[in-house]
């Protein structure tokens, strides 16, 4: 009986630690929900991507030039606005606006999902770019018999995909079951 009690206590501690590492940030919850709904992607995908990309730091400037919650580069921001959203491009400073950053990131993830149809491939393209992923998909060394990526030759992109997929699984377990 005592061991069962310790088991429940350990599970509770483990869950609390996981929720600390993979939070539902109330600060961005409404914008994440709205952007996911607007662009037809599962809310959990945005939570996992933001957690992995920026850890919810809206002013983060990444080493690759990415800015904000979704770590979009100014070039990606312009491409998303003009090619996907069919909008006039705004100043890259808008990437620091969490709502705009999330909207553009969600639009891009939606576009990538329509293009690839598999979340692992979507996350690879989100990290490495579509031209790179398209080249990998044409190389039999990197795809399985179904034409899906089986291994990612870029270690940084492979780690990113693994991390986002892990975050997705934990967000589902903790909040979206």
Task: Mark where each language-model region is.
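Substrate-binding/active-site groove segments that recognize
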Residues: 64-87, 104-105, 136, 143
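Catalytic and substrate-binding regions of cell-wall glycan-acting enzymes that process beta-1,4-linked
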Residues: 124-177
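Second-shell loop/turn segments in exported
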Residues: 17-22, 32-35, 58-67, 87-98, ...
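Solvent-exposed, polar/charged alpha-helical surfaces in well-ordered, non-transmembrane soluble domains
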Residues: 30-34, 47, 78, 103-110, ...
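Surface-exposed patches in mature extracellular/periplasmic domains of secreted proteins
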Residues: 44-47, 60, 116-125, 175-177
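Export/targeting segments at the very N-terminus of extracytoplasmic proteins
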Residues: 9-58, 81-84, 167, 174-175
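Cell-wall polysaccharide-cleaving catalytic domain and substrate-binding groove, primarily
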Residues: 51-76, 108, 129
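Hydrophobic membrane-insertion alpha-helices, especially the h-region
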Residues: 1-11
């Amino acid at each position: 009986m005592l061991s069962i009690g310790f088991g429940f206590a350990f599970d509770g501690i483990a869950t609390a630690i996981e929720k600390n590492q993979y939070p539902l940030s109330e600060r961005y919850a409404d914008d994440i929900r709205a952007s996911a709904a607007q662009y037809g992607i599962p809310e959990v995908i945005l939570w996992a991507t933001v957690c992995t990309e920026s850890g919810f730091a809206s002013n983060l400037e990444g080493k690759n030039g990415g800015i904000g919650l979704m770590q979009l580069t100014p070039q990606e921001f312009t491409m998303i606005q003009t090619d996907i959203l069919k909008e006039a491009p705004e100043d890259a400073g808008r990437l620091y606006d969490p709502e705009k950053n999330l909207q553009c990131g969600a639009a891009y993830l939606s576009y990538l999902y329509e293009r690839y149809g598999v979340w692992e491939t979507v996350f690879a393209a989100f990290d490495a770019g579509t031209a790179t992923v398209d080249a990998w998909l044409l190389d039999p060394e990197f795809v399985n018999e179904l034409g899906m990526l089986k291994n990612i030759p870029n270690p940084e992109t492979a780690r990113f995909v693994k991390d986002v997929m892990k975050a997705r699984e934990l967000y589902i377990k903790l909040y979206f079951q």
